[in-house]
Amino acid sequence: MKRLLKSLKTKPMTLVVSLPENTYEMAKAAWEAGADAIKVHINLFHNASLIKFGTIEEQRPVLEKILHDSPVPVGVVAGENTKVSEGVIEELVRMGFDFISLYGHHMPVSLCNRQDVSNLFAIDYSYSVEEVKTITNSFIAEILELSILPHEEYGSRLNARDLSRYLAFSQVSNIPTLLPTQRLIYPSDVQAIANCGVKAIMIGAIVFGHDLHQMVEQIKLFKQAINELKQ
């Protein structure tokens, strides 16, 4: 387990694909196109894809099939409520998820400092650099997700000030940082993002919508940009 964490620690940049819908077709297309890891969702309304994801029981058949067949690590967002998420953590681990992603203020204590699954600790715009320094130099988190954009700014173009914020968080973090595409990010931005110390880019609905063919095309373009990174 913890294959994503190993990738973040050993590769210059890792490409994670956040599926806009939990379908086997999309998952298979993502790993075949070159995704290094994929992420699914349960128990929440997703602000980027505008999709409501159901419970673990409602989605168990497709999730189990994805987990069984995927050659790359699969992670899951366990919800948007601490108590609800806490109630499914052990089952998600039993199912074989490699990492579990939650905002820090939704993450149950039971997900900290585990050996059997990685926690992907997401921060929003309310977390200060000083707080992140404490979090990422402790037992609390293993991977830091920079989900720092207010919802009303989703889909707006990446700008230079964003880079300064990614750099600030990466500089104080003792764990790998992962950037989700809340902003509109192009493959041509990958080098600048890597220069900020970010170790993974997670592309999703903001980049490719819900179209499978567009998703595949963007995965290939981002993977090419990653392969061309200058050290």
Placement of each model-derived feature along the sequence:
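Catalytic cores of alpha/beta
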Residues: E25-A30, K83-R94, S126-S138, R183-I201
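C-terminal helical cap(s) of enzyme catalytic domains, especially alpha/beta-barrels
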Residues: K52-G54, C112, L158-N159, V207-Q231
